[in-house]
Regions:
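Amphipathic terminal alpha-helices
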Residues: 14, 31, 40-43, 341-398
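A hydrophobic C-terminal alpha-helical subdomain
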Residues: 227-235, 240-245, 312-355
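Conserved Rossmann-fold NAD(P)-dependent oxidoreductase catalytic core, especially the SDR/UDP-sugar
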Residues: 101-108, 112-118, 122, 126-176, ...
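NAD(P)-dependent short-chain dehydrogenase/reductase
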Residues: 157-158, 187-196, 200-253, 258-263, ...
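Mid/C-terminal beta-alpha module of Rossmann-like enzyme folds, strongest
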Residues: 264-331, 371-385, 432-435
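N-terminal Rossmann/SDR dinucleotide-binding element
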Residues: 1-101, 105-108
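Feature captures hydrophobic
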Residues: 377-514
Length: 514
């Protein structure tokens, strides 16, 4: 096979993403799909939601915001902390044939682990080792790993991108677990040189204020939003909230908006020359505690913070406001001192044209606005799909659609019989965008049977239908006219070979219920 054809086939293969349901994962999934990258996701079902529902709710939110129908990833139901990530042999076979790289993003932000049989060790260290073993099992050598800038632990000064183990201490088990996981990734003998992303503290969306988790900066914002409104305003409308903070207020904090982090990682992931490097994804302009306080002052019309720096405060006279505030931020007290400086040479080389949004007063107010609307994570989520699954009946393969059929067919291939007239041989890909869509590879060898497997064809010359599922269902009659406007890799004169077989097959396999 020529280098050109190898490269072409590589572009048609899938990227396996872990952690797609987390904050950064939601944005990585969006940006990869918008970039036209074929994505498979490893997702764990919950007691209340199937894996398809979990991913569907994320994509429905993006579609409402972007006002565009997105492609659907191939969804693999599994568990990161289980052997082979909880995947079946058939799923592993599919990855072996269809996946070219892994973007391991999943992690748990737990600061204290009771023992190594619990979090954060189970996911951050054990889960990463399971992903490495899965790469060996499937023959994937291109691993992209989302670490954290804080594998540097308690180090000060300039932190080099290629530095890791210099005998540093750590503030908590989260930092140590991510350090150990990155060590495993770097030492893995069956990978090419891994690409490692080390984001700083991740905050919400710079444009909308959205977040799905309230850690880091949001812990402080939520606490302020809870405590300050309890204090009655004086005759001038000002709330006096006396509190002494053991800092100067000018200590730099490396905080980065999640949408920028995802945009940068997507750029680096798709830049061949960036492979094998380590990247500190940290801000152009650090945030300071004084800025956060002043921005919150202006939002809540309050005042009262005193910066004590290294001067010990007299704790005999502590206001109720101060006592409650300090008690609630104890887990982050180890971060009161200045952040180190993260070397960004590699980052600037490959993505220096993507500036990091500065967290200014307007953006911090946007974060506060979103937190208030979201009731700081307590608002009931209403993510009803545009097209309810009860309105659609499909025999195209889905992980939870027919467990017995999948057990007998090995998940990767399902045979569909049609009661219509015999079909001529054909091979197509279905890329059905929008609510409850998906990606499939359909092959008919003649007669009344066709084989369907998840994922798009890996051959560049196989025609692929790109269309929203709702549009396909609502316009069957229109689709009997020339279909080339909906297809990739198909010329108008080719329509007659598979137009009617396709529509005939879809009428049998995908219909609206009455």
């Amino acid at each position: 096979m020529s280098n050109e054809s190898c490269s072409e086939k590589s572009q048609l293969k899938y990227t396996l993403l872990t952690g797609a349901t987390g904050l950064l994962g939601e944005y990585l999934l969006r940006d990869l799909l918008l970039k036209g990258i074929r994505v498979a996701v490893l997702v764990r079902p919950t007691k209340k939601m199937t894996v398809t529902r979990r991913i569907e709710e994320i994509l429905l939110r993006w579609e409402r915001e972007l006002r565009v129908a997105l492609p659907r990833p191939v969804i693999l139901s599994g568990c990161l902390t289980s052997r082979n990530c909880g995947l079946t042999n058939a799923q592993i076979d599919w990855l072996r044939s269809s996946c070219e790289r892994v973007l391991h993003n999943a992690a748990v932000l737990t600061f204290v682990g009771v023992d190594r049989a619990r979090e954060p060790w189970v996911t951050n260290v054990g889960g990463t080792q399971n992903v490495l073993n899965l790469c060996r099992e499937t023959g994937v050598s291109d691993l992209h790993y989302v670490s954290t800038a804080y594998v540097c632990g308690e180090r000060k000064g300039l932190i080099g991108e290629n530095q890791l183990d210099v005998g540093q201490g750590f503030r908590n088990d989260y930092e140590r677990s991510k350090f150990e996981a990155e060590c495993h990734v770097r030492e893995c003998s069956w990978l090419d040189d891994p690409t490692i992303y080390r984001p700083a503290v991740i905050s919400g969306d710079s444009e909308t204020g959205y977040t799905s988790t309230y850690h880091g900066l949001y812990l402080y914002l939520r606490l302020i939003a809870m405590l300050v409104p309890r204090v009655p305003a004086d005759e001038n409308g000002i709330r006096h909230t006396p509190i002494r903070l053991p800092m100067s207020g000018g200590e730099p904090r490396n905080v980065v908006p999640v949408d920028w982090v995802a945009k940068v990682i997507t750029r680096l992931l798709t830049t061949t020359e960036a492979r094998g490097n380590t990247f500190h994804i940290s801000p152009d302009v650090p945030l300071t505690p004084r800025q956060v306080v002043e921005y919150c002052y202006s939002y809540f019309n309050s005042e009262g913070v005193i910066y004590c720096a290294d001067q010990p405060a007299d704790r005999d006279e502590v206001s109720e406001f101060e006592r409650e505030f300090l008690q609630n931020i104890q887990m982050y007290q180890a971060y009161d001192r200045s952040d180190p400086i993260f070397d960004r040479a590699n980052l600037l080389r490959f993505s220096g044209d993507i500036p990091c949004p500065e967290i200014d007063e307007q953006l911090l107010h946007r974060y506060l606005d979103f937190g208030e609307r979201d009731r700081w994570g307590k608002r009931r989520k209403n993510a009803a799909p545009h097209l309810d699954p009860a309105e659609v009946r499909t025999t195209l393969p889905r992980p939870e659609a027919d467990p017995e059929a999948y057990a007998s067919s090995g998940w990767s291939t399902l045979t569909i019989e049609s009661s219509g007239p015999p079909l001529p041989p054909f091979e197509i890909g279905l890329d059905l965008h929008g609510p409850w869509g998906g990606q499939w590879h359909m092959v008919g060898n003649g007669g009344n049977r066709m084989k369907v497997r998840p994922g798009l064809p890996l051959k560049a010359d196989v025609p692929i239908l790109h269309i929203p599922l709702v549009e396909l269902m609502n316009h069957f009659d229109d689709l009997e006219r020339p279909l080339h406007q909906y297809f990739k890799n198909v010329a108008a004169f080719d329509d007659g070979r598979w137009c009617l077989p396709l529509v005939s097959s879809l009428r049998q396999s995908l219909t609206a219920t009455q």
